[in-house]
């Protein structure tokens, strides 16, 4: 397995191009299952999860063509010949569950393995299944698989989600596009990635209104057609590199970054002593003074994103004073804490909250990544630490971040990937 070797203590300065959003691109690829025509996606991130999703779509019989030879522009199209999503692929990535709704809507049946992905709590799929049942699907669980049928097709219904689940919103949204009649999704998630999915689906001929309001209305259509769509910039990647500027006391220009996608993160950064400026095509982030402790609580959008919690905790570990981080979205999302403490951080976990008492400096140490976002929190700590940090199991990082070592090295970081 690959490792990163990081020698910390260097201020980062320079430009970093923010790639396409992982959490948008995966769902946009799945949307290709809703039409027999070609869906062309531009600004696709070159990450491991995209490779896994391509394998899954090809398993269903559709073609995923690399139009420019570098993975950045993909075309999805063709006939669905297989409605089973097998365990060996689905277990690698939780987003695989999102093929369930489109397969059911388009083919009237689907057999999808229960999902895998990051080891963050149980992350149940109950809301996906209950919502599809409300649309008329017949669903059973057998031997680790979801068996779903809609022999008479899906029919629009009013669905109230008990929690603003991103995945359930996306699955039901895509399924409803081809359902008969009108579907309403109440308490729908409002993330920018969902707005990006809606824009693409409407470009394919769907009739969806209510983006960003928490209540989506979908008028079903008989068929969708192809289109060309550009994937939005990755707000989590942008927020992560903003933390890199903050923790190293440097200045980065994050090309493609948008403050309007990162409101809660920008406010927390500014409260912590990091300056953030929106320029025409970029976000400029810099720190010149001391970091200050702040309290944050993860919440559904537009609240502070759970996918930024680990990175922000690394930043707070070297801030003056005490901070508290409360995780309300996922259980078991503090697995990075013991590794940060190995580097000299002072963090104590109490239930769903972590108390961080800032230290003057961190020390390099051998550490191990446990999930996608936690892996980057350890890189951030390594960039700020004295001495050498060796980060193992970086395959977690490769699932969601593109060209990490190259982007950081161009801005002055001493980071090297060692392949084994």
Swiss-Prot record:
HAMAP family: MurA. One of its GO terms (biological process) is UDP-N-acetylgalactosamine biosynthetic process. It is found in: Cytoplasm. Transmembrane segments: none annotated. It is an enzyme of class 2 (transferase). Cell wall formation. Adds enolpyruvyl to UDP-N-acetylglucosamine. The keyword Cell division applies. Phosphoenolpyruvate binds at residues 22-23. The modification 2-(S-cysteinyl)pyruvic acid O-phosphothioketal is found at residue 118. The lineage of its organism: Bacteria, Pseudomonadati, Pseudomonadota, Alphaproteobacteria, Acetobacterales. Belongs to the EPSP synthase family. MurA subfamily. Keywords: Cell cycle, Cell division, Cell shape, Cell wall biogenesis/degradation, Cytoplasm, Peptidoglycan synthesis, Pyruvate, Transferase. UDP-N-acetyl-alpha-D-glucosamine binds at residues 94, 307, 329. Its main location: cytoplasm. The active site is at residue 118. Its EC number is 2.5.1.7. GO terms for cellular component: cytoplasm. This is UDP-N-acetylglucosamine 1-carboxyvinyltransferase.
